[in-house]
């Protein structure tokens, strides 16, 4: 297979291993009920301010292999974003890039190399965080799409590529463009393990409306499907006598779906439909109870379905009417909702390491409100607006926000197809029913790109309805280890205890430290975990100091600076010694 090479590839291939592990410093919690609070909400929702490379590393102890869905919207590298390469890679060529704004095409001849060097270690960490049946989505355009695909093939494996979604982000051309006016972006989709993924979107009312029950079948509503197929199979070529007496044969170049014997079985089971007058070419009844729980997604998503860039800007303007926001291409919440719906799990953990305006969190909250789910979000944002914009938007989504003006809502949407054209009268009747709803000052029909929608417009003056929910805000703290690989005591002993306990058990340390059991972390799975550590002196595990063990267990794992116990002695008593700091696991 072709390989992707770039300046610095060999230097960044394992750079994610060199990134220091930092603790997360909790700054505050926020909930719909209490507002801002000093206590941790324990909601599982997190917003982290800091470099996403270090933040992703900090998430590994708790979330490695546990994230259900990842969505990222990295810099497109158009030359306009003014992003800066800041990864401290030990290489002379790369060190020259540090702190430099990446320039435009034709001005900066290493711009694509810088982008690939920036993305590669982050994608490696994202891959480690993703669950075995997890989904990965990345927004991109043509500037780097051609480089992103082979890079993701390296990390995920080309066999785990699912598809490239085309999102229609603009609804009108930019006439000042010299050649083409691009009106789409891509959303690249990969699985951690394709064999464990089943992509389905929730069934829509429009899809379900295609089912009916004209013959009152006890099995419920159904729709008819074609009884002829191709290519021709000889045993499936035979004449059929309809209930009306008319004789029909398959269309030219096709045959019937079933053999004559199986056709009779379907008749006996009342699964063949000849139309209301018994004179239609036979079709097979497909019951809604027998179809998949969701719908197979298509790869072209129009702005009428999921919104466009101007919709996204309007959303942000509603939330921050007096602010000039540093975003040219935010993503509409509807787009994120559809992406997240592909991971058909109401309890999914969702990660966005390029959080921007916080659209991903807003989409998670909307979905939870809509279906009663308990999805969690983790957002990471490097820039200083992580608090003022990203977190502030999530606060407003949770509690509602002041708004004065008209708000449009898609009440119902239909595909323009033969089935819906036949029931156009029913659509008009539904439109009239919505017009009776006093909530909406105006209800109209709007058509666009093969869809027709009933739009309700309401005037809101005051506070919008919030989604409810809560989150915790964190800053990236100090690294657990100093450059010399000794423990960094600045982070505090409790953070070190939590880190060690998690590396050993994959569990959170809930047990509080008390004076009588100073060195005990906790007991888990019949093993007692001890961190025999003193800030001012070395600790030695010996017969004289075994009194640090304060609770009986089947096995004991003890961290200390030194050990004087013989191996045979420890084996006889099921004691495992680990040296500080050498044996503390690094992520």
Predicted features along the sequence, with ranges:
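Coupling/switch/interface segments within P-loop NTPase motor domains and analogous charged loops
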Residues: 1-12, 270-274, 546-547, 556-562, ...
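DnaQ-like (DEDDh/DEDDy) 3′-5′ exonuclease domain used for proofreading
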Residues: 1-71, 76-121, 437-440, 451-457, ...
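Conserved S-adenosyl-L-methionine
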Residues: 4-6, 13-15, 92-93, 116, ...
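Glycine-rich adenosyl-nucleotide cofactor-binding module
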Residues: 37-61, 310-349, 366
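SAM-dependent methyltransferase catalytic-core segment centered on the flexible catalytic loop
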Residues: 64-135, 143, 159, 184-186, ...
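Signature of N6-adenine DNA methyltransferases within the class I
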Residues: 119, 132-133, 142-200, 387
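Active-site-adjacent helix-turn-beta-strand microarchitecture at beta-sheet edges
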Residues: 191-322, 332-333
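PRPP-dependent phosphoribosyltransferase catalytic core
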Residues: 370-587
């Amino acid at each position: 297979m072709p390989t992707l090479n770039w300046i610095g590839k060999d230097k960044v291939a394992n750079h994610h291993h060199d990134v220091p592990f930092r603790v997360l410093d909790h700054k505050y919690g926020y909930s719909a009920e209490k507002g801002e609070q000093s206590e941790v909400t324990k909601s599982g929702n997190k917003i982290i301010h800091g470099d996403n490379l270090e933040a992703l590393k900090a998430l590994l102890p708790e979330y490695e292999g546990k994230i259900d869905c990842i969505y990222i919207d990295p810099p497109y590298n158009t030359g306009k974003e003014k992003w800066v390469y800041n990864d401290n890679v030990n290489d002379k060529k790369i060190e020259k890039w540090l702190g430099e704004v990446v320039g435009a095409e034709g001005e900066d001849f290493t711009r694509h190399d810088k982008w690939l060097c920036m993305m590669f270690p982050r994608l490696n960490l994202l891959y480690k965080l993703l669950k075995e049946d997890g989904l990965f989505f990345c927004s991109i355009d043509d500037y780097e799409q051609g480089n992103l695909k082979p890079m993701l093939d390296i990390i995920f494996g080309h066999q785990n590529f699912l598809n490239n979604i085309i999102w229609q982000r603009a609804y009108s051309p930019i006439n000042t463009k010299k050649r083409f006016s691009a009106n789409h972006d891509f959303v690249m989709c990969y699985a951690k393990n394709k064999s464990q993924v089943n992509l389905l979107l929730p069934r829509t009312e429009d899809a379900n409306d295609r089912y009916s029950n004209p013959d009152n079948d006890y099995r419920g509503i159904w729709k008819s499907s074609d009884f002829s197929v191709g290519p021709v199979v000889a045993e499936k070529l035979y004449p059929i006598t309809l209930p009306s007496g008319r004789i029909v044969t398959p269309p030219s170049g096709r045959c019937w779906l079933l053999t004559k014997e199986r056709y009779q079985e379907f008749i006996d089971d009342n699964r063949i439909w000849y139309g209301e007058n018994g004179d239609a070419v036979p079709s097979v009844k497909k019951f809604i109870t027998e179809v998949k729980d969701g719908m197979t997604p298509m790869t072209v998503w129009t702005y009428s379905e999921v919104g466009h860039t101007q919709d996204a800007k309007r959303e942000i303007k509603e939330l921050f009417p007096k602010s000039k926001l540093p975003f040219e291409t935010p993503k509409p919440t509807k787009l994120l909702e559809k992406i997240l719906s592909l991971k058909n799990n109401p309890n999914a953990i969702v990660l966005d390491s390029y959080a921007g305006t916080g659209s991903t969190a807003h989409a998670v909250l909307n979905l939870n409100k809509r279906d009663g789910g308990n999805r969690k979000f983790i957002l990471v944002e490097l820039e200083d607006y992580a608090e003022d914009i990203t977190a502030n938007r999530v606060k407003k989504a949770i509690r509602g926000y002041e708004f004065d003006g008209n708000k449009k809502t898609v009440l119902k949407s239909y595909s323009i197809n033969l089935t819906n054209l036949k029931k156009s009268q029913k659509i008009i009747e539904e439109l009239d029913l919505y017009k009776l709803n006093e909530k909406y000052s105006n209800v109209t029909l709007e058509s666009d790109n093969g869809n027709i929608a009933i739009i309700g417009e309401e005037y809101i003056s005051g506070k919008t309805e919030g989604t409810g929910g809560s989150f915790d805000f964190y800053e990236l703290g100090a690294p657990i280890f100093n450059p010399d690989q000794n423990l960094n005591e600045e982070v505090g002993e409790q953070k070190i205890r939590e880190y060690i306990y998690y590396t050993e058990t994959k569990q959170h340390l809930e047990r509080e430290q008390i004076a009588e059991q100073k060195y005990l972390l906790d007991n888990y799975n019949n093993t007692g975990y001890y961190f025999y550590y003193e800030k001012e002196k070395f600790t030695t595990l010996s017969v004289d100091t075994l009194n640090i063990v304060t609770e009986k267990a089947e096995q004991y794992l003890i961290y200390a600076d030194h050990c004087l116990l013989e191996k045979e002695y420890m084996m006889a008593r099921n004691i495992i010694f680990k040296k500080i700091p050498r044996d503390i696991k690094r992520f």
